[in-house]
Amino acid sequence: MKNSKKRLLIAGLASSMVLSMAVPTFACTGIIVGKDLTTDGSFIFGRTEDYQRNRTMRLVTHPRGEIKKGDKLVDVNNGFTYIHKEDSLKFFSTPDSSKKPKDMEQGVYDAAGYNEAGVGIFCTVSADPSDEVLKADPFVKDGVNEASMTTFLLAHARSARGAIELLAQTIDEKGASMGDIVAFGDQDEVWYMEIYTGHQYVAIKYPADKFSIFPNDYWLGGVDLTDKENVIVSKDIVEVAKKAKTYKETADGLMDMAGSYGPKEIAETSRSRVWSGIHDLDPNSKVPYDAERFDLLNDLSEGSEKIDITHALNVFRNRLDGSEFTPSDNKAERKANPKTHKRPIGSINTMQAHIFQIKEGYPKEAPGLMWMTLGSPLNIPWVPIFPDINDSTPEAKNNSPVYDPNSYYWVGSSVNDLVSGNREALGESTRKTVTDFEDKIMKELPQVEKEWIELYSKDKAKAAEFSTAKTMEWEKEVFDLEKGLQKELSQVSKADLIDHWARKPIIDAISKKLMVGTSDLKFSPNEKITRGEFITILGRLGKVDTKKYAEVKDKNIEAGKFYTEYMNWAVENKLLPKTSKALANENITREEMAYTLAAYLKLIGDDTSTQKLVVFDDEKEISDWAYEDIQFLANKEILSGTSNNKFSPKANLTRAEVAQIISKLDK
């Protein structure tokens, strides 16, 4: 998934206003496993959706006829329109919130789902063509893109091939506004399609004996464009590439699609994902990390085992497992460490993931399951969604555009954040909780499937009621599990610590109960800290017996507050400078903190002598009463300057800075 405006920018069609827009990183990853390579004969295909994590994800059902013949679909992002030629089929999808902020793309982004004709669809894994082919066939400003295509395809497609043909016809008539990869499946076949430029595309019927991992680049190699049964292709696919002087052929004389339309080099974020995904599914693969090209269609190597659904689901949790690389979800961190830090498939930035499993023995109009997580599957269980459901839980369809404690997406995403804030301590145990639940579902599923298939053969309406009830039961169980994890993990981590410079000392302070969050989920590391908060933290570090300090020691100390006894302790032991007036709710300055820390260390018998003079460029701004204390603490390397050799004595302390200082004191 990605911002379609970026595609127009690359094509040279965007205005200068768009040039200044910040475009979020996109990193969707697709998977296909042919039925000959799976343990049970299932055909598997799906993707992760990675983009802006503040976009609420939902599971929504649409009854037959919800969209009427003649209704107009309008993509408010770019003006694309589609007139529905008939009433819509029944379908379900996984769209964004319909209440998104004005500064966010307002498209529907139905993303993935099944319809009642038995067609499973996901849209899209985005990709960039080369500049040369875009000049030859630019994107169309109001052309079709991922924000709208899933809606009309699920509403009307009656087969996987029919979905490809409908999308191809739409591109022929209206053009495309971005580069995309899509996959559609039904009981008989799975189709894979690459959309390259404004009017050029190629789709293939996916072979049953291959597997693929496809991040955000083009991967199709040689394609026989004359094979009408297995290939659907735009009419000018050869001419445009030749016009752009990028046309390439394979050794056996077939048009090389990625070579002709893709960029000259694979993006590093794609390289790390395709390589790790191939080696995950095929442990005996010899494909090197630095390969010039990665094939779309892969064989299982000799000695590698067939793939079951659990294995396929876990690919979307792969964090470069067993490799020499360090997984990193942070673009700046990867840029600073390009040789060691790589973008993994399993990422905190995944908004949702879906894997279709076309299964043997299922009805033609309901040919398989869609396994789903709303939020990243790293720490959220996969749930199987039956294709004929009538509804989802209130939590799963919660439309809130911001955090809501009753939202499946937001609660699960907060658990992912909490784990990422303290992955070393929480990652393994949380994952076990999640996979234990998935094991439970896997054990229940065969009997549920048997009952549902029997019902479906007799009464489709009752079968839909049954599958809806069971799916909602699992959704509710997952929501309750995630709520429990949220409550448990928030005691030892917070959701706003990911990639923060003080993450480790903050986690240490939380685990030792020296500091607490500003809410159940937030630590607010960059907020200023008050005098009362700082003294309370210091008192906890010193294991102060608060019962001894119940008597109020200063008229400015308010009784009955969390800090009352600790402030009394500080006043009695002269830990506060006179300038503070014992006002607990004022923000504390860096020089006052130095005075208080030095007084505390003297109180517990620490050596307060200094060995050398530490010079700060702004030392004239330091108050006389704090100068020696700052020297003492700088000598002990408990305190340092802020930047440019300045101490910034009058600046306020942040909660993160306090955690860092406390971690040094506690050693």
What are these regions (language model features)?
Residues 23-27:
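Sec/Tat signal peptide C-region and signal peptidase I cleavage site
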Residues 246-361:
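Glycine-rich, aromatic-lined ligand/substrate-binding cores of catalytic
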Residues 430-492, 510:
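Histidine-centered catalytic/metal-binding microenvironments
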Residues 329-454:
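Substrate-recognition/cap regions that form aromatic- and gly/pro-loop-enriched pockets
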Residues 490-504, 511-591, 597-627, 640-652, ...:
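Feature responds to low-complexity, polar/acidic, surface-exposed segments characteristic
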Residues 28-145, 166-291, 296:
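A contiguous strand-loop segment
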Residues 12-20:
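Bacterial N-terminal signal peptides
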Residues 2-11:
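Bacterial N-terminal signal peptides that target proteins for export
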